[in-house]
């Protein structure tokens, strides 16, 4: 049998109804989950936009590297092809930057501002917990004197303890009432707050990918050679690769 120590300074009287405590824990638990979800979403959105920018910047660098390749100086068709690619990559990068800026302004920043509210909320909960501990301590003190023989000194101390208890009880009840009223309102406000951000995110993605469809459609028309299917190009590449492999400098020993 395990030993359970007495709780020093704990009142016998149930000063906070269990239903009230359950309601408080439920509402605060929902806000703790919302805080974590907000933090994670902000982090993931930042990682996503950083990856988008890195992708388009890399694509531009690749096209510039191809333009500086000596092969482009020797073949006008190849130069035209790579120039078209470079133009497309720069257009893509420009639209990508616009998209990222829009997401930063209308999604990431609102997420950051929303998340900045939680430290104040958590501090209010801590103040409520401290008020509850003070309430329990003084209630236990009152109960201790109530159980003693009612002598003059004891009655004086009991009166003093009750006077000390009254403002502490009122302070806790006010803090508890305020949190129970405002936590559900705060949680319910998340939909109205975030809906414009998510609509902006969707619009930014739609605009970006619509522009990408145009850019790569134009690029495809510039690069297409009449009468050449993907299968034909693949066969031609394989034939050229076979010719290269036949050279003595790359032949297997």
From Swiss-Prot:
Biased composition (Basic and acidic residues): 227-240
Superkingdom assignment: Eukaryota
Principal subcellular localization: cytoplasm
Native organism: Homo sapiens (Human)
Record keywords: Cell cycle, Cell division, Coiled coil, Cytoplasm, Cytoskeleton, Septation
Presence of keyword Translocase: no
Record-level GO cellular component terms: actin cytoskeleton; cytoplasm
GO molecular function: cytoskeletal anchor activity
Subcellular location: Cytoplasm, Cytoskeleton
Gene it is expressed from: BIN3
Descriptive protein name: Bridging integrator 3
Alphabetized PANTHER family for the sequence: BRIDGING INTEGRATOR 3 (PTHR47174:SF3)
Function: Involved in cytokinesis and septation where it has a role in the localization of F-actin.
One of the GO biological process terms: endocytosis
Pfam families (UniProt xref): BAR
Free-text tissue specificity from the UniProt record: Ubiquitously expressed except in brain.
Disordered: annotated span: 220-240
BAR domain boundaries: 9-232
Residues in coiled coil: 18-51, 120-152, 231-247
């Amino acid at each position: 049998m395990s030993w359970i120590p007495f709780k020093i300074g704990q009142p016998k009287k149930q000063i906070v109804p269990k239903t009230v405590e359950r309601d408080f824990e439920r509402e605060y638990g929902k806000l703790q989950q919302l805080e974590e979800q907000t933090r994670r979403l902000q982090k993931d959105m930042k990682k996503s936009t950083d990856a988008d920018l890195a992708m388009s910047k890399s694509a531009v660098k690749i096209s510039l590297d191809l333009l500086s390749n000596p092969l482009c100086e020797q073949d006008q068709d190849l130069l035209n092809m790579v120039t078209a690619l470079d133009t497309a990559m720069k257009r893509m990068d420009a639209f990508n930057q616009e998209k990222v800026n829009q997401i930063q302004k209308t999604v990431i920043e609102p997420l950051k501002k929303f998340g900045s509210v939680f430290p104040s909320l958590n501090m209010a909960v801590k103040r409520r917990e401290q008020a509850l501990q003070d309430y329990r301590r003084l209630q236990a003190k009152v109960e201790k004197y109530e159980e003693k023989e009612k002598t003059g000194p004891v009655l004086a101390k009991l009166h003093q303890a009750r006077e000390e208890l009254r403002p502490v009880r009122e302070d806790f009840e006010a803090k508890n009432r305020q949190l129970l009223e405002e936590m559900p309102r705060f949680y319910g406000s998340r939909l109205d707050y975030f809906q414009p951000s998510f609509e902006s995110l969707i619009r930014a993605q739609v605009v970006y990918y619509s522009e990408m469809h145009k850019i790569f459609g134009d690029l495809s028309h510039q690069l297409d050679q009449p009468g050449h299917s993907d299968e034909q190009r693949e066969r031609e590449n394989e034939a050229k690769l076979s010719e290269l492999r036949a050279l003595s400098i790359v032949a297997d020993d």
